[in-house]
Every structure is written in C-alpha cells, then in structure tokens.
Design a protein with these regions (language model features):
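Extended boundary segments
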Residues: 1-13, 127
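Short Ser/Thr-interspersed hydrophobic loop/turn segments at strand-loop and sheet-helix junctions
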Residues: 9-22, 42-60, 70-75, 91-104
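Amphipathic alpha-helical coiled-coil/heptad-repeat segments
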Residues: 83-85, 89-93, 100-102, 106-109, ...
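His/acidic/aromatic-lined binding-pocket segments of jelly-roll/cupin-type domains
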Residues: 40-41, 50, 140, 147
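Ligand-binding loop in jelly-roll beta-barrel domains
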Residues: 65-66, 80-86
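Short, well-ordered beta-strand micro-motif
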Residues: 13, 77-79, 124
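Sequence-specific dsDNA recognition surfaces
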Residues: 1-3, 15-48, 65
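Short edge beta-strand segments in beta-sheet-rich domains
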Residues: 7, 70-73, 110, 118-120
C-alpha cells in the first residue's frame, strides 16, 4: 500500500538500493501492525545495504528516516556495533568495483540474478591490524558523516521547497521583502 502517512513505515526494497545512498523517496510503506515483532529488520542510520537480487552487489548507506525504515526481502544489511564510527573499512570494501564484480560472479538465476548472503560473506579481503583499522575507520567516519549529513540536509531543503514554492506561487505565502518590492514598483 503506497501511503505517506506518518503512521506508516518505509519498506526498503531491492530497487531502492542505489549506489551511495539509499533512495527513500520511492519506497513503499507498511503499516504499524505489519512491523510488530520485526525489530531485527529495523534499519539504522549508517547501515550499509546490498542488493541481492536484480541489482546484485549495489550498495548504499541508509540516511536518517522518520518514521523508521524496515528491510525487505532480498536486500542484505551490513552493519557494525558502533554504526558509522567503525564502518569505514567495510564501506570502502563493499563500495569497491571488485565487490560488485565478485557479487555478480557469485550470482545465479536465468531470469534474474540472485546472490546469497553466504556468497557475499566469502568476498576475499585483506584485514589490517586492529590499530590500523581503527585509525582508518576514524578517518573515514568523518567523511561518511559529512556524506550522510549533506544528503539529509538536501532532503530537508527539497521537502521545504516542495512545500513552500506552490504556496508562494499561488499567493498563499507572502514574503515581506517581496511585498515591499512590489509596493515600491507599483507606487
């Protein structure tokens, strides 16, 4: 059911997994009753999602979303205990062309490509010593925070524009500066 009521929750599907940031604009919505007992599928800001059918190997970060978003079938989630703070290495590995190529090579299916979570977990990666990994994750966390924050601010501004512009054009909303300029031009 496609409703945008605040009583409903976003359901993230395969097609919503876009490179970089998850596209929450076109998501479907599910009711509160549908998600009862499904907290393990609730997404958090900074979760890294991966397409497992169709868009095999595509990955994107989950931005803030209110009300909450929930994971749907055939979308995998990669998350860390500390969220964005220690996601850097995993993010860079999963966003690499090598990961996408690996996922596609592991996929099967004649009508639509499918890959299993176990196959994705077999992606060969070099694991650095913990101290180096922590320093790397710390540096990348700042970048990921900026990426997520910029996206979230852009979404807020887009919503504000979509709300205010029609009211401004129709005359329902008046800006004092505009009114003064119009008065100066008329008189």
């Amino acid at each position: 059911e496609k409703q945008t009521s605040l009583q409903n929750f976003t359901g993230v599907k395969i097609g919503d997994v876009k490179p970089g940031i998850i596209d929450l604009e076109g998501c479907s919505y599910v009711t509160r009753e549908t998600v009862v007992g499904l907290d393990r599928f609730r997404l958090s800001r900074g979760d890294l999602l991966v397409g497992m059918t169709g868009y095999v190997g595509e990955t994107g970060l989950v931005p803030s979303v209110e009300p909450a978003a929930y994971l749907n079938q055939r979308v995998g989630r990669m998350a860390t205990e500390s969220g964005v703070a220690d996601l850097g290495y995993l993010y860079c590995a999963a966003r690499s062309p090598a990961f996408k190529e690996f996922a596609e090579a592991q996929s099967h299916g004649s009508a639509q490509a499918n890959v299993s979570g176990a196959s994705l977990m077999a992606f060969p990666a070099v694991i650095a010593p913990l101290s180096l990994m922590e320093r790397f994750n710390g540096a990348i966390a700042d970048v990921l925070e900026v990426v997520l924050t910029n996206h979230e601010q852009a979404q807020t501004l887009s919503t504000l524009r979509d709300t205010l512009l029609p009211r401004l054009i129709s005359g329902q909303l008046r800006l004092p500066e505009t009114e003064n300029l119009v008065k100066a031009l008329i008189f």
